[in-house]
Amino acid sequence: MEKRLGVKPNPASWILSGYYWQTSAKWLRTLYLFYTCFCFSVLWLSTDASESRCQQGKTQFGVGLRSGGENHLWLLEGTPSLQSCWAACCQDSACHVFWWLEGMCIQADCSRPQSCRAFRTHSSNSMLMFLKKFQTADDLGFLPEDDVPHLLGLGWNWASWRQSPPRAALRPAVSSSDQQSLIRKLQKRGSPSEVVTPIVTQHSKVNDSNELGGLTTSGSAEVHKAITISSPLTTDLTAELPGGPKNVSAQPEIPEGLATTPSTQQVKSSEKTQIAVPQPVAPSYSYGTPTPQASFQSTSAPYPVIKELVVSAGDSVQITLPKNEVQLNAYVLQEPPKGETYTYDWQLITHPRDYSGEMEGKHSQILKLSKLTPGLYEFKVIVEGQNAHGEGYVNVTVKPEPRKNRPPIAIVSPQFQEISLPTTSTVIDGSQSTDDDKIVQYHWEELKGPLREEKISEDTAILKLSKLVPGNYTFSLTVVDSDGATNSTTANLTVNKAVDYPPVANAGPNQVITLPQNSITLFGNQSTDDHGITSYEWSLSPSSKGKVVEMQGVRTPTLQLSAMQEGDYTYQLTVTDTIGQQATAQVTVIVQPENNKPPQADAGPDKELTLPVDSTTLDGSKSSDDQKIISYLWEKTQGPDGVQLENANSSIATVTGLQVGTYVFTLTVKDERNLQSQSSVNVIVKEEINKPPIAKITGNVVITLPTSTAELDGSKSSDDKGIVSYLWTRDEGSPAAGEVLNHSDHHPILFLSNLVEGTYTFHLKVTDAKGESDTDRTTVEVKPDPRKNNLVEIILDINVSQLTERLKGMFIRQIGVLLGVLDSDIIVQKIQPYTEQSTKMVFFVQNEPPHQIFKGHEVAAMLKSELRKQKADFLIFRALEINTVTCQLNCSDHGHCDSFTKRCICDPFWMENFIKVQLRDGESNCEWSVLYVIIATFVIVVALGILSWTVICCCKRQKGKPKRKSKYKILDATDQESLELKPTSRTGIKQKGLVLSSSLMHSESELDSDDAIFTWPDREKGKLLHGQNGSVPNGQTPLKARSPREEIL
């Protein structure tokens, strides 16, 4: 049972390698080695900071590094320098060795055994540097530093080296696509072969049931050994391992005669079609078996030598459909050891884009391919054995089934053609020729034709002919298709000489005239010729000889005849063309005798007029005659006198001055023979019957303020003669306010403006030409403004003519800021002059949908409040006054509001609370009762009077008290202190007792120093104080002496 298998590339590990110089100039490598060592010395000295982290080990040149597993190598991004590569490896704990290859820094993690393998490149551009880090020196799977010379001393055959295929993917320091691009670029550069150190062979199962494109594989799943190989060119090199013999010799393992077989490289292209050249035999080399003590993987087990097998898949195979099967055989030059067999693995490398097919025997020596589609297929066969590996390539080209060619068919159009001079050019089309593939060549050849200087021969699809001469031509068209098949056909062309046909004379149709007409014009310009007429000649036919006639223009196309008489005239026209050919034509003119009939007069239909129409027209233009009417005459034959006829001698006359009655007017017409005819017309004039006009006004009008204009339509009024005047009047009971615009009260439509609330009644009077009139009545109802109570008016300090639309918009915007609403929410209803220098603006404020209108008194109060808080110049115009349009003050229910002054008019016995008006909101009111104010005022006045009297009395009592003056005398030391209280002359005043003076009293009396009098003169005169001896006046009791403290109080 077949299974669809996919052939995938073998995921062997790979590594980059540089250019390998194929020169024996050792001094160049020595110079490069010296330069590199010098750079590392400078690098070591300039990186003291990193010296504590890692130390430089030995450096190996011409040696590369290969990963034994996955993700042990990674490429440092960018274009680093050698110093930055070394520093990066030191800073990375996973980096133990780095490989410097032509400006690329490849770092490696070789901390695990079998993770890294070294191989020799023999290129001075390849350098491997070991770094000594903490606890990592023993873990490296490389050769000891002392064993480096063993690798450098190997004798390699450079001519047999090949670049090793990739076996291990680098760590993804860069993107996978970039790595693959870089790898392919390095692989194309071509470098010498490399030697791979042996590794331990690992086994893994490979699932052979994977799909590859459209190919299917039959067979069962097999288990193969995954063997690491060095290159596809069968080079088997084994490097000397540490501890092994230093002398290595290369032993060819192929028979004689094959050692000199040249090796060819596989040629691959990135295009769709790729060609792979099979790899012939290449020499194989082997070296000494390594010792078990030293290996790159730090293992004691010996590594087997991989033997390179020379594999051939045969020559390239090419088949052509319908054959779609092919068999590929793989051949191995070396025979397998006894008891062993080779395993085969066929892989599809290159294939066409949309391909399909089946593979059978994918893991056998013979691969059978079937059901292949056209295209190029490249197969690779991998042969593996015990410690042996080889590859071979072969191409299979499947060509499409060859097409069976059909010869083309030559087609010319037209096949037969005839032209006449002066036409001397034409074309013959051969592009309609057909072929099953493609016509690649057209060839025209003139087979037959008149004698000329040069025959026609062209290689175009369309044959263009010119300067042809009269004669018969035969042209041959030969077409060639893409396969070389041909076909021919012919085309015939006849060129005739120019033909000059005789002219065709045309003298026109026969003519008939009647006397007295005796002249006519004949036209011969309808005569034709193919090349043109050169002359015309008119003549009288022999049958008309002897006729009297005058002829003019006998040598022109037009003949004028006159003075003809009654009879038949035959004229002959002779025309001549450019070569003298002539043609004739005849025309007959019949002159009939005169047959005159009298004219037919037609005065027109009767007419009926109604006064005041007193004029009309009389039309006789429909009168007729067989010849010609030469005169018209209008006359009044019946009717009242006093009429006037204008243009009475013409076909159309005008009658004026008609009166009530019946008139008869007669028309007389005459022809050239003085024959005449008459016709009459009646004109009836009736008295006027006037009907009075009818006045009609279209419906009543209802408007709602603030709309204050209206129009009344009286144009439907009618009259039989026409209305001559309209007059609109206002009823006496209508409001007097309102204006008539443009004197429209005398027009059919009345325009009114500035109407006020109320009902207007208007009367329309219409009058006709006779003075009769009619009237109609209508009303105009003006309803109050539903927003009247919410209207706010502002008196602005600006002339109304100076308030522009821009200033208005700015002012509305400022009002919106004060009220906290949008500009569109403020609807201005009216702007009108208030005084000569002020303007009144009326508006209302509504909110956003559903457009609810704010209360007018709240808006006015808010504006007043906000303006008090703002600066005086906040508005662009000073607001002189802000109020509602209608006065909405309740006047404390004791008065009414004056709509003009917007203030309260209080009822009797009530007055305004001026304190509230002045100190609070300033709103007029009628809160105070006059009676209460009078009582309160009286009480206040009385209280103030009492208070004033009390204050005055207190002040007077204070002023009426006598002041006590103390008189002191200086006493002798032996005298006693005494104080005499002098009696007053007033009766009824008690006298105070004497108070003895002492030194304390003397000091206390100094508080009232203004009243102290020192009476030194009394002492000098020897006068004694009253009561000095303790006596008291009669009738008085001695006062108790006060203590000094009481005296002070």
UniProtKB/Swiss-Prot annotation:
MANSC domain mapped to chain residues: 49-127
Gene Ontology annotations for the cellular component aspect, listed alphabetically: cytoplasmic vesicle; Golgi membrane; nucleolus; plasma membrane; trans-Golgi network
Carbohydrate-modified residues: N247, N395, N487
CDD domains listed in its UniProt record: PKD
Domain (PKD) ranges: 310-401, 409-498, 504-594, 600-688, 694-785
Modified positions (Phosphothreonine) in chain numbering: T974, T1037
Intervals, Extracellular compartment: 51-932
The entry's keywords: Cell membrane, Glycoprotein, Golgi apparatus, Membrane, Phosphoprotein, Repeat, Transmembrane, Transmembrane helix
Cytoplasmic side: 1-29, 954-1049
SMART domains, per database record: PKD
PTM per Swiss-Prot/TrEMBL: N-glycosylated.
Source superkingdom: Eukaryota
SUPFAM superfamilies: PKD domain
Record field: transmembrane: 30-50, 933-953
PANTHER family in the record: DYSLEXIA-ASSOCIATED PROTEIN KIAA0319-LIKE PROTEIN, FI19480P1
UniProt function note: Possible role in axon guidance through interaction with RTN4R.
Subunit annotation: Interacts with RTN4R.
Protein name as it appears in the record: Dyslexia-associated protein KIAA0319-like protein
Organism of provenance: Pongo abelii
Gene field: Kiaa0319l
